[in-house]
Design a protein with these regions (language model features):
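Metal-dependent phosphohydrolase cores
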Residues: 1-168
């Protein structure tokens, strides 16, 4: 069963899945299931969350929802450990925010053809922490949705544990 955080919809049964079905089963994307992300989720689940909600918002505003879904799924397609990278960082070395965006973009381009729009979305999803500014409306949307999903991934499990503790 494939779902986004705070959604009850089965994602394999709707138009969203048509946009990402060729990517989601790939070995590289599936590897993300083994990496913890934002404390209580996996990098795979985070990417699905960003992908799905970016798709929904872009569709609502009649923007390129297909590219948003694809870029959202691939925006964190990197495999190094962020904590190790930051601990061993030397002067002049790119920040994690910049490095992982560029690495995810390179990995995405190895996996599939990415459009200029998708490249902008993946490379700049950490704006304003990184430069330059996004070129497209869809890039601003994925940037906002990425932060929104990070907050949900951090807070929702805590709220669920709190509620479960109250009902005992």
């Amino acid at each position: 069963m494939l779902k986004a955080i705070c959604s009850s919809k089965e994602l394999t049964d709707n138009s969203y899945y048509d946009c990402v079905s060729d990517l989601i089963g790939s070995e590289q994307v599936q590897e993300l299931k083994n990496i913890t992300h934002h404390v209580s989720t996996t990098r795979f689940q985070h990417c699905v969350n960003v992908s799905y909600y970016s798709y929904i918002v872009c569709r609502k505003f009649k923007l390129n929802a297909r590219s948003a879904a694809r870029a959202g799924l691939l925006h964190d397609l990197f495999f190094y450990d962020r904590k190790e990278y930051n601990a061993s960082k030397i002067k002049g070395q790119a920040s994690h925010s910049k490095k992982h965006s560029m690495e995810a973009c390179a990995n995405a381009a190895e996996l599939t053809h990415i459009t200029c729009l998708e490249r902008d979305m993946i490379e700049k999803h950490m704006w304003p922490a990184t430069r330059p500014m996004p070129r497209y409306k869809e890039t601003y949307i994925i940037t906002i949705i990425d932060k929104y999903c990070a907050v949900l991934e951090f807070c929702v499990p805590r709220v669920q544990r709190f509620i479960a503790g109250k009902t005992r």
